[in-house]
Swiss-Prot record:
Name of this chain's protein: Oligopeptidase PhomG
Transmembrane segments: none
One BP term from GO: peptide metabolic process
Entry GO CC: mitochondrial intermembrane space
SUPFAM superfamilies: Metalloproteases ('zincins'), catalytic domain
Function description: Oligopeptidase; part of the gene cluster that mediates the biosynthesis of the phomopsins, a group of hexapeptide mycotoxins which infects lupins and causes lupinosis disease in livestock. Within the pathway, phomG and phomG' are probably involved in the processing of the phomA and phomA' precursors. The pathway starts with the processing of the precursor phomA by several endopeptidases including kexin proteases as well as the cluster-specific S41 family peptidase phomP1 and the oligopeptidase phomG to produce 10 identical copies of the hexapeptide Tyr-Val-Ile-Pro-Ile-Asp.
PANTHER family assigned to the protein according to its UniProt record, in alphabetical order: PROTEASE M3 THIMET OLIGOPEPTIDASE-RELATED (PTHR11804), SACCHAROLYSIN (PTHR11804:SF84)
Gene: phomG
Needed co-factor(s): Zn(2+)
Organism from which the protein derives: Diaporthe leptostromiformis (Lupinosis disease fungus)
Length: 713
């Protein structure tokens, strides 16, 4: 019996996706005008919770006109936000409240309201209200608007990217036929070539399997150099960030950004990076030596020699490591068809957290007037609590296929709050609506969408963001989100479930068992391989395979942490220069390539006489553009926290519904209503420790409690 009945939206109307380019602009201008009026009268809360919803289309809509209009709306919001939070009159009123710390006005505030006022005060200060001289405040505001426009332009360039590389037929050796069949045939002088897009679903399997080193290098360099127009924009962004931080009285941008986060200082970040880099360095050196040995052996079998491993070799030789692992990898994706995997994952989450995800079909969507999805392939879910009283928790959207448009968003994109949650004036809750957009290759009539292990892990990770956003319940919309250096922890914790044998097996399901059409697709692939009357594949992975898979990620973990250390190190170097003059003299491209080589102990084009500017990978570093500036270390800190949370709550029994509900209530539900360090210590019962993380790096999960994380309190 369906405990929920047929009503999807009895509790709250979901958002509508019926915008037009003109309506977006009108809605944005109306929202800004209403907000300004509210501030002018100071009689109501700031109603900006729809801002993310209106800019949602810029990275999801198949309509270029709507994407462009949404980008323009983003500029309107950016400028309006700067104007609002640089208003001295409102700042003076907020400041007055905090100056009365021991008086009645503050005493009447609950803890969440006081915390909100404190964060609001810091936001005003960081938007120029702390600058005494009027002329400098005007300068600051102008530069902040310019900075916002530059970031939006870089993102637009990335979203509209159509870059790729032409590959001749002789360069395709090793690349899977399933990928080759999807590539566009050239004409004219490229009539005997195929176009390989640089977007991840195409370039990743190509560079992982191409046998020719020259081909791998071409693909890698095309990826690194696809955003040449962003080179000067990125430089101006870095310089403007530094300049505006100094106008506010900070030593640099990193000092400004960390002041309002868990780590509080760049020095604390640098200490964390140093500890992790020291721990991972010997493991990385061993990893590189193992891969180089594989390259040498392969070269010897071809009658050539190889003395060095390059960046474009890493994915290829990592995939070649170990014949047993290689055999597993070649067929493992057949057990992770996209839609089936997603459904099974949601089922695990339903059990663990006491919830129900009800897919809303076309008939169900007719219950509400208007467009409830932005594309016909989008899936919509109403989310309910079923552990106790039935309770509507909000609406989720899932778009997992490659978007039907030329521009390409990143491989995954969580729009965490198309609508943020908050408490209405009558005490009722306005519930969040969230969206997950995954840029997987779309299925065809002859081939389903099958996920690699990395893609399945990524799916678990992004759904972790979705749950955190969806289940947070705060009094104020502004406190819905957590600090940037905590935001990755809940998602990374959820990843750990996929490396537990039971969950890998539960999620696995060979696509030939889904339905007869899928079975025919699978049989067709065997005909191509000259197999006749093959035995049926088992429906689920065997215990032996699952056992190996649960332990096969150690080398990938090391390379993954190297990537995070590199990006976090580069992020801090550009945002914490020795001086303004040093930053102005800095070659950001050269620094990017030198830092990467130093961290990985692997070289790129500079080893072949191409100099240190052979690739400008900093221009495709999306995170540093989008709210992770001077905050990329959050991925490492998030992993540290995630391992500690997993060990404390789920290590002994990952299927415990009691543990899941405790986690949902103490972490997900809390959101940003209190200091994130308090959330961590309340849940753990102790200060966070790096020991579970370091043990994970070493491939062990036992030992003493280890040192605590060097986070100021």
């Amino acid at each position: 019996m369906d405990l929920l009945g047929d009503q999807h939206f009895a509790a709250q109307q979901p958002p509508l996706f019926d915008a037009t380019p003109s309506s977006l602009k009108e809605d944005a201008e109306e929202l800004i005008a209403e907000t300004i009026a509210a501030w002018d009268s100071i009689v109501s809360q700031i109603q900006t919770e729809n801002a993310t919803f209106l800019t949602f289309y810029s990275s999801t809509s198949p309509s270029k006109d709507l994407r462009d209009a949404s980008t323009a709306v983003g500029r309107l919001f950016n400028d309006a936000e700067i104007e609002l939070y640089s208003r001295q009159d409102m700042f003076e009123r907020v400041d007055q409240v905090l100056q009365q710390q021991d008086k009645q006005v503050v005493a009447s505030l609950d803890e969440e309201s006081l915390y909100y006022i404190q964060k609001l005060h810091r936001r005003f200060h960081q938007n120029g209200c702390g600058i005494a001289e009027e002329g400098q405040r005007v300068t600051f505001k102008t530069k902040m608007k310019r900075l916002g426009h530059l970031v939006q332009q870089c993102n637009k360039n990335l979203n509209e990217d159509k870059s790729g590389v032409w590959l001749g037929l002789d360069e395709l050796d090793g690349i899977p036929q399933s990928l080759i069949s999807r590539l566009k045939q050239g004409d004219g002088e490229n009539s005997d070539h195929l176009w390989l897009p640089t977007k991840v679903p195409f370039s990743s399997p190509a560079i992982t399997n191409a046998k020719s080193e020259a081909t791998r290098k071409r693909i890698y360099c095309a990826i690194q150099n696809r955003m040449e127009m962003n080179v000067p924009l990125f430089r101006e962004i870095v310089l403007l960030r530094d300049e505006t931080a100094r106008l506010l009285g900070y030593a640099d941008h990193a000092t400004l950004k960390t002041a309002d986060k868990m780590m509080q200082t760049p020095q604390a970040v640098e200490a964390l990076l140093s500890e992790i880099r020291t721990a991972v360095a010997p493991l990385a050196a061993q990893d590189v030596e193992e891969l180089l040995e594989i390259k040498r052996n392969e070269a010897e079998s071809r009658g050539t020699t190889a003395d060095e491993l390059y960046f474009w070799d890493l994915a290829y030789y990592s995939a070649r490591r170990g014949e047993a692992e290689k055999k597993i990898s070649s067929s493992i994706s057949e057990y992770f068809e996209l839609n089936t995997t997603l459904a099974k994952l949601l089922s695990i989450i339903e059990h663990l957290f006491g919830t129900r995800f009800r897919r809303v079909n076309a008939a169900g969507r007719d219950e509400a007037a208007g467009s409830l999805i932005w594309h016909k392939d989008v899936q919509m879910y109403s989310v309910w609590n079923v552990d106790g009283p039935k309770e509507f928790l909000g609406t989720l959207f899932s778009a997992t296929g490659e978007p039907p448009r030329p521009p390409t968003p990143p491989q995954s994109l969580v729009i965490p709050t198309a609508l943020q949650g908050y408490e209405n004036t009558d005490g009722s809750l306005f519930l969040a609506s969230s969206a997950l957009v995954m840029n997987y290759v779309r299925p065809t009539d002859t081939r389903p969408t099958l996920l690699s292990l990395d893609e399945v892990r990524k799916l678990f990770h992004e759904i972790g963001h979705l749950l955190h956003s969806q289940w947070t319940q705060t009094k104020y919309a502004a406190l819905h989100h957590v600090d940037r250096d905590f935001v990755e922890a809940p998602s990374m914790m959820l990843e750990q479930f996929f490396w537990v044998e039971q969950h890998i097996k539960d999620v696995s399901f060979h696509y030939s068992h889904i339905n007869s059409k899928m079975k025919d697709m699978w049989k067709a692939t065997l005909v191509d391989q000259d197999e006749t009357n093959p035995p049926e594949k088992p429906a689920q992975l065997s215990d032996d395979v699952v056992f190996n898979l649960a332990r096969a990620n150690q080398s990938k973990a090391i390379q993954g942490q190297l990537k995070e250390v590199f990006f976090a190190t580069y992020d801090m170097l550009v945002h914490k220069p020795a001086s303004r003059a040093a930053l102005e003299a800095l070659n950001l491209t050269e620094l990017f390539n030198k830092t990467r080589s130093d961290v990985y102990k692997v070289r790129g084009g500079e080893a072949l006489g191409e100099g240190w500017e052979w690739g400008h990978g900093q221009t495709v570093f999306r995170n540093i553009l989008n709210r992770y500036d001077a905050g990329y270390y959050s991925y490492l800190l998030g992993r540290v926290f995630a391992m500690d949370i997993f060990d404390a709550g789920f290590k002994e029994k990952t299927t415990s519904r009691e543990a899941g509900r405790r986690y949902r209530d103490m972490v997900y539900r809390v959101g940003g209503r209190q200091a994130e360090m308090k959330t961590m210590t309340d849940y753990l019962g102790h200060e966070p420790s790096t020991h579970p993380y370091l043990a994970w790096l070493q491939g062990t999960r036992i030992g003493d409690s280890g040192p605590t994380v060097a986070v100021p309190t």
